């Protein structure tokens, strides 16, 4: 970085330079280096040329062009005094409003005082006859935009580093009350040390942006509130910062694929710009903070510096980063990042493999302790166990061993079923108690269970990530597999309930088996051991001989009590053995498992049956008859159980004699032989035989004559006997019919067969689906073409109707077979001749959208839009509106709904359906539609207007004219609110940011309608006011309509609305800028029928709340700077009191704007700086001289200097009439030589008469103020400034005197500039009357000082 120089451009010429040296030679010397030649060659390729010498830049030599913008170019330059390389931004004066030039020069003087490592230093300015040259610090490595253009996209880490520095610079600017307004990659410059600097702040906001509502500059980075002309704030810079992040990450800003106007439209309409797909969650969160739509909710730069992404990127809490990223490292990281983006996916695959190695799956963890030789009953059990196993964190637990002696295989298999309880008595209370007692549970106290903080509790339970896990697979053992399998295998004839008492108990710990040396090793049971067999075999419980079964049951009943005691004893011994071992390491595991077993036992016993309670005598009878067991395998025979009923004679309990007679209940009397029934059965059999024969004769090999006879006979039989439908289906007649339809060309055969098909499938979705599956849809759809007769097409339409209204499946198959094209073809028929076909098409398309299937409606819209379906549909709408009746209204509603669905589809569909002919036809028929359907169609138009690419089609179809007329005609109808809601939204979308459409709406009379809506309809006010306020930004035609409808007075009345006062004041300022003289005159008028502009401004500033007060200061200070006469009317105590209360606002931007407003009022007043003392603001402004914000400090100091200068000269004590007297002493020669007023020369007597006439009036008329203010004010953009308005008595002399006084007042503000004649050359265009007046005043001041 080159060192900064504090020397201004007014430094003396260097002695080594030859004043008359040609510019070309100097350029040659500057361009001798290789880098300079390369830059020069690049500039030549880009069409850039070096700047011409500017005579006023006497201390600088311009070099090559670094870049071009909308308002000027930036050149590299060399300071001849210091050798420092600087950047010079040349702005053409012709591109600047004259009212802004002086403000820009004043602001540069303020911005020179700003100094921060992350902002570009302003060094001054030099004004020439054609350009304004702003001298800036030079950053040698260019912008981030150029780096991204040369090297590709930035990685997130580097963007975070750069954004950290940008936020530091932005925070400094915001603390100083400066809004950047144009943050983007091209305005973020870099140095070789990796330091980034914000450029083009302050002055950039004056020279770029929206000029007369046209897009100039960089719209892709603009915040929504800036586009909507609501005023830029510090939050607007945060939005632009988010767009810059996307620009660096993606290489392009948001919406870069769109033209500027559509991009602006999308920025305002979308919730937020599209986020980069590959961005990390932290970056996406950062962007969402930046893209808050409401600027009041948007985060500040100070808070963004604390965002995790920025903190992680910088890892520093200091205000200025201590060590910056080197430029070469930054470029290298960008190159490596883009190479990684372009590389194949092998790296990603390698990374994935490495992650798998770091986190091995659970299968490896389970098999790590498994020996190589394992004997299992079945390989399926191991696969299942491994598949659903969970990873073990430390030691492997095996619940199977915990239940080794508790649960026998027989306990896990269901016992046999018995008829009376469906469980065969094997799950009675005693049997359940016996099974429950086998788990070896010992009753433990609750205190032992409730000892928490068990580190192994989670290992005993299934993990949350593996909900299917229940019992882990046991570690295998190298043991005598044959022995253990013979003892415990699942294939034994009888599964033992538990091991004998002398069997060693072998618990599991840490995946290793602890063996008893005196006992044989027992192999662990696989999970399949406890799996219930799908084929139920209960041969161990049920014997072929019932005597054996009875003995077993009696034995079970006798030994139940002893078994329970024995099992309990064994379970206690098991628990004691396990507890004695586990006390060393994990004493809580056994207790926890035992308590869980105990709780399971209690729960099972709650639901156990009691055989003593099994008394069904109330159902089976009091005799206690016992049922014999069925001999079947399943043991369940529903017919063996009969309820006890009152009809005992027919009951099986009372009538044992008929038990062996299976036909006892069928002893009904048979009727005598019915002759008629026999004839009917015989006729039906012959009919069936006939139909089957006809169906069998339907072959493609038959002659067409024969096929014609067969089809006619079949149709006749089917019409006479509809029940033959099932016969045709059972005879597989559908396929032969389809084959003949596909090949036959005789239309009579086709018609007969189509009628048969429609009759068969009518209202039978199963047959329809079968027909679809065998390919019937495309065959029958073929007959819907226009080449076939009307009768055949009607049958095809009937088939189509069945397809789209029966089921979702048939609809999907109909669409997949090209059915939508058939519907569109029906729509294209003539409504008069083929009304039925057209209505089938309308109802078909409506049914397609109404059926709730899996296919999105957008897909249907896209398919139909390819066929331009809305064109014939709009024609049908016109014909339907000509009819009356319920059917016509239903069809009208369905057509409106179809249009509305198309407007909700994707943008591509909207563009395809927005044809001028369709829109024109729809808009034409709007008035004839019923109110409900009219609102639906207006929603269709509104949705189309939300897409920028459809606005031209809407304009070409006279949408604004039709909608304005419809709004006018429905203003007194009950549905006006709903209609106006849609219309105002549409007109707002169309007129926003487009002058031609704004003028079109104004010419169609939208302005008085909107004004009426604002006064009467409160909810609709929010839709009408944006359109009205935008009218001030339109051209001459729109403003002419505003003048005709008192638009300026309407804007003034809006200043009392806290929600719209900022927008209204901005509209007044824009209007004043366009038509300065006329608007100023009306603003200065005092009328009895409306409040004055001055009173409205004072009331607005006095009553406005916090946010509204901050936002209104920016347009107000612009307006006062543009019109000093208006500013002079605001020198009021109540206004200064309110400004004094806000001078110590927390935001530097508010304090700075307040000081600017006070400065504008003081400059326009006769008392100048004396107003500060008069209204008690002097002390408050003195305190601001020590403000932390540099610009506030500097502005306050200049105001204090103005006040002190005014006091020293005593101007505040001079009366206004004394000053007028001195003005009248100007010699006639000087007056004759003045060239400011273009008025005829009058005699001295007329001048004197005018002077005395004006002197008699203590307050000059406002019209005279307005006229005098025009002398040195820039003309409006509509044309040259009108002539000077004369005084009240029509004399020009009084006007001329007021001109001189206005000039003196305005010249006093020049003193705020540095008193350097070199800084502002004499080439500044001023009227000749200014210089004599200024010299005379200076002499008068010198005399007073002496």
Swiss-Prot record:
Ranges of Basic and acidic residues composition bias in the record: 35-50
UniProt cofactor(s): Mg(2+)
Keyword check for Lipid biosynthesis: no
Pfam annotation, one family: Pkinase
Keywords, alphabetical: ATP-binding, Cell cycle, Cell division, Kinase, Magnesium, Metal-binding, Nucleotide-binding, Serine/threonine-protein kinase, Transferase
Active site: 182
EC number: 2.7.11.1
Record domain Protein kinase: where: 60-310
Cellular compartments per GO CC: cytoplasm; cytosol
Protein name: Cytokinesis protein sepH
Highest classification ranks of the organism: Eukaryota, Fungi, Dikarya, Ascomycota, Pezizomycotina
Gene that this sequence comes from: sepH
